[in-house]
Structure formats: C-alpha cells, structure tokens
C-alpha cells in the first residue's frame, strides 16, 4: 500500500471519527462529511489513474457532483436551523418536523 493511500485512508478515518465524536454541532458534522468526500475523491482518482481504467474516469466527477449537492443541502439546512433557533445544534433538527 502506497503512502498516498495510507494518508487518504487516515484522512477518511479521522473525518469519520470526528463525525462520530463531535455530532452536537451541525457545522462540525458537515465539515467532517466534506473531509470524507474529499478523501474518497482523491482515493478514487488515484486508483483510476494507477490502474488505467479509462471507462471509470467519470466516477470521481460524479462523486464531486453528489458532494456538491450534499454540501448545498447541508448548508441550506444549517442556515434554516440557525436563523430559526439561533444555534446550530443537531438536536434542533427534530423540532423541524410538522
């Protein structure tokens, strides 16, 4: 296993641990999710480049599209919760139900 894979796996694991440990604030959860997506993107891109899989070269772009959609939805939810309640606690998401 090369050093690049080890670093990206370490970045993914640190982001996952951050998501599991610091889930009280929504902003920290969103940052951890973005870190996970970034490490997955780099691992996928390096794997495709190393194996010369030309048919799978669009997969990292598709992952980035989904990551951008996730970030937009997460930030809009963060803005809605913070303007409604004045704080970004994840526990306020249960209060948004009708």
From Swiss-Prot:
Localization recorded for this chain is: Mitochondrion inner membrane
Lineage, top-rank taxon, reads Eukaryota
Looking at the UniProt entry, the stretches that span the membrane are: 1-21, 29-49, 61-81
Q: Is Manganese one of the keywords?
A: no
Q: Name one GO molecular function term.
A: NADH dehydrogenase (ubiquinone) activity
This protein's GO CC annotations? mitochondrial inner membrane; respiratory chain complex I
Instruction: From the UniProt record, list the reaction(s) this protein catalyses.
Output: a ubiquinone + NADH + 5 H(+)(in) = a ubiquinol + NAD(+) + 4 H(+)(out)
Give the principal location in a single coarse category.
mitochondrion
Q: Which GO terms describe its biological process?
A: ATP synthesis coupled electron transport
Q: What is its EC number?
A: 7.1.1.2
Note whether Chaperone occurs among the keywords: no
Keywords from the UniProt entry: Electron transport, Membrane, Mitochondrion, Mitochondrion inner membrane, NAD, Respiratory chain, Translocase, Transmembrane, Transmembrane helix, Transport, Ubiquinone
Q: What is the topology of this protein in the membrane according to its UniProt annotation?
A: Multi-pass membrane protein
Question: Which family does the record claim for this protein?
Answer: Belongs to the complex I subunit 4L family.
Q: How does it assemble?
A: Core subunit of respiratory chain NADH dehydrogenase (Complex I) which is composed of 45 different subunits.
What job does the chain carry out? Core subunit of the mitochondrial membrane respiratory chain NADH dehydrogenase (Complex I) which catalyzes electron transfer from NADH through the respiratory chain, using ubiquinone as an electron acceptor. Part of the enzyme membrane arm which is embedded in the lipid bilayer and involved in proton translocation.
What protein am I looking at? Answer: NADH-ubiquinone oxidoreductase chain 4L
Originating species: Sturnira lilium
| Name of the coding gene | MT-ND4L
């Amino acid at each position: 296993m090369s050093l690049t894979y080890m670093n990206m796996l370490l970045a993914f694991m640190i982001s996952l641990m951050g998501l599991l440990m610091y889930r009280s604030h929504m902003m920290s959860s969103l940052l951890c999710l973005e870190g996970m997506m970034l490490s997955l993107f780099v691992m996928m891109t390096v794997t495709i480049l190393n194996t010369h899989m030309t048919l799978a070269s669009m997969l990292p772009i598709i992952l980035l599209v989904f990551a951008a959609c996730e970030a937009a939805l997460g930030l809009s939810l963060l803005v809605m919760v913070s303007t409604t309640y004045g704080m970004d606690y994840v526990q306020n998401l249960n209060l948004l139900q009708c």
